[in-house]
Swiss-Prot record:
GO BP terms: cytoplasmic translation
Start and end residues of each stretch annotated as Disordered: 92-154
Matches recorded under Gene3D superfamilies: 6.10.250.1270, Ribosomal protein L24e
Superkingdom of the source species: Eukaryota
Protein name as it appears in the record: Large ribosomal subunit protein eL24
Family label: Belongs to the eukaryotic ribosomal protein eL24 family.
Segments of skewed composition (Basic and acidic residues): 96-122
GO CC term (a single one): cytosolic large ribosomal subunit
PROSITE patterns membership: RIBOSOMAL_L24E (PS01073)
PANTHER family (UniProt xref): 60S RIBOSOMAL PROTEIN L24, RIBOSOMAL PROTEIN L24
InterPro entries named in the record: L24e/L24_sf, Ribosomal_eL24, Ribosomal_eL24-rel_N, Ribosomal_eL24_CS, TRASH_dom
Gene this protein is translated from: RPL24
SUPFAM superfamilies the UniProt entry points to: Glucocorticoid receptor-like (DNA-binding domain)
Keywords assigned by UniProt, alphabetized: Ribonucleoprotein, Ribosomal protein
Amino acid sequence: MKIELCLYSGYKIYPGHGKRYARTDGRVYTFLNAKCEASFLMKRNPREITWTVLYRRKHKKGQQEEIQKKRSRRTAKFQRAITGASLTEIMAKRNQKPEVRKAQREQAVKAAKEKKKADQVGKRKAPAKARATAPKTKAPKTVKAAAPRVGGKR
């Protein structure tokens, strides 16, 4: 299957489509349709006709590759203080030995677990008192009656 290109528009011409125009000097032109042929015979410049491929190339339409060429800024590493911790504190923590850091972490975890346990014990005592004071009763739900249908076929 041979696919040709329209001389005027630049679009592909599939077999069974298009039109050939032979001039008296022997040159043969292939056109996609009568519109392209008529424009060619009127000596219209395809670079100025908006729907042609030549116009789209000239005016850089529909080219995603161009967008990718734009360079993105490189991220630069920058050290600065964070809220609640100065840069010197951060650097001191970073330069600590792993054993010291591990011991601190374990100590912090232990303290958090103890606090959680104490909170749970406090929570267990409070709900027991609340249950004994007032048993709940369920209120019956009011069911809304369906409105009568008015007019119409259905």
